[in-house]
Amino acid sequence: MPKFDIRERFEKIINAPVEVVMRTAYDFDLQSILPIRAIISMRELIMGAGGEKSPRKALGLVAETRALGWGTLVEVPNQLLVCGAHCQPWFGNVKFTAIPADEFAVFDLPDQVKIVWSLETTKIETNKTRFVHEVRAFATDDEARRKFMRYWSWARFGIIAIRILLLPAIRRRAEHEWKSRSETDTA
């Protein structure tokens, strides 16, 4: 998404091959990190998100976001995943709706925000990977932009904190998995 209202990019160097890093990111249970669960609960409290909740099942990052309504725009195994949706994030019970990849660029339903997020791996050298997670959002009209920027003015702190907590956790798990696998292979 070349045109955007906000862009947040986070990256880590991980001592593991790209396929281990990407699989770890796909399978990582975002809410397994207590402070992330607290941030999500705090948003729900602040925004007055209510309704009945079914018991949460531990899902990987990609499975959970797809279950929430995100669609896949681009997927290159072990290299790149780009997911996108439209929503009105200023509501407590935000509903993400996937946009087909071939319609995403021209999607302009009023009073919506288009959001893309990506996971990307780049091999730096053998068993060393640059892992990037990026989020971009673009409001479809001026009224949506006004609402979104007001929401973003405070919500970004939690959203950014989630990424700051998530990437090191993915790094630790991928490096641990790679080290364990390497030790098993040499034994």
List each language-model region with its residue ranges.
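Beta-strand residues in well-ordered beta-sheet regions across diverse protein folds
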Residues: M22-T24, G84, V132-E134
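Structured surface interface patches that mediate subunit assembly and partner/cofactor docking
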Residues: K3-F4, A38, E44-G48, W70, ...
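Short, highly charged C-terminal tails/helix-capping segments
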Residues: R171-A187
